[in-house]
UniProtKB/Swiss-Prot annotation:
GO MF terms held by the record: tRNA (guanine(37)-N1)-methyltransferase activity
Protein name (Swiss-Prot/TrEMBL): tRNA (guanine-N(1)-)-methyltransferase
Gene3D superfamilies cross-referenced by the UniProt entry: 3.40.1280.10, tRNA(m1g37)methyltransferase, domain 2
Alphabetized UniProt keyword annotations: Cytoplasm, Methyltransferase, S-adenosyl-L-methionine, Transferase, tRNA processing
Self-association state and partner proteins as the record states: Homodimer.
GO cellular component: cytosol
GN (gene name): trmD
Chief location category: cytoplasm
The species this protein was found in: Pseudomonas fluorescens (strain Pf0-1)
InterPro entries found in the cross-reference section: Alpha/beta_knot_MTases, tRNA_m1G_MeTrfase_C_sf, tRNA_m1G_MeTrfase_TrmD, tRNA_m1G_MTases_N, tRNA_MeTrfase_TRMD/TRM10
Highest classification ranks of the organism: Bacteria, Pseudomonadati, Pseudomonadota, Gammaproteobacteria, Pseudomonadales
Any GO BP: tRNA N1-guanine methylation
Catalysed conversion reaction: guanosine(37) in tRNA + S-adenosyl-L-methionine = N(1)-methylguanosine(37) in tRNA + S-adenosyl-L-homocysteine + H(+)
Amino acid sequence: MASLRVDVITLFPEMFSAISEYGITSRAVKQGLLQLTCWNPRDYTTDRHHTVDDRPFGGGPGMVMKIKPLEDALVQAKAAAGEAAKVIYLSPQGRQLTQSAVRELAKSDALILIAGRYEGIDERFIEAHVDEEWSIGDYVLSGGELPAMVMIDAVTRLLPGALGHADSAEEDSFTDGLLDCPHYTRPEVYADQRVPDVLLSGNHAHIRRWRLQQSLGRTYERRADLLESRSLSGEEKKLLEEYIRERDDS
């Protein structure tokens, strides 16, 4: 059974109980599909205060994470995960994480994630040890722990056996370059709003067509940039044209 090992270098290992103890990722850990280990740079300091940061050269606000504690933690993580493990630094300067990137990461046997804090980490550590830098969006967080958890969750969903239904990951938003279609469950009528009749018809071909059209329409309205990088089939073009026409006529 294929599995993924993820080691995280973080000042707050307790945060990752959200991954190991809850939801799909917890189930993956229990099934042996995901192995998660955290390494705290404070454990690799030698001074009384367990100092992991210092003032930046050149002045300026904030503090910068020191190289040595990070480097020593990385040595231990690589000893456990293997030298071939890909080292990833989560930072606003990285490439934006997309579903296609997640698919590539899910093919890995081992990942080592670096969760920075303060103003960031010493650039010399990045140059010497980091294979890839990834960002989860154009905004700033207090540290790399949440982005690391986002990456772990997204990758875990693609591990064979991690989801309850084999098709669930394939039907997620972005998997085929489109946003997801609307979903409904019981009751059929709520506050005078009805579930679309096509979903109650039992006609699987019509349902598939409706769902594809809704995905295309949502993507057109909310994330048109995704359509620019996707080649639409003849059926998809027709469905999108129908969607736009019906929307404009309503």
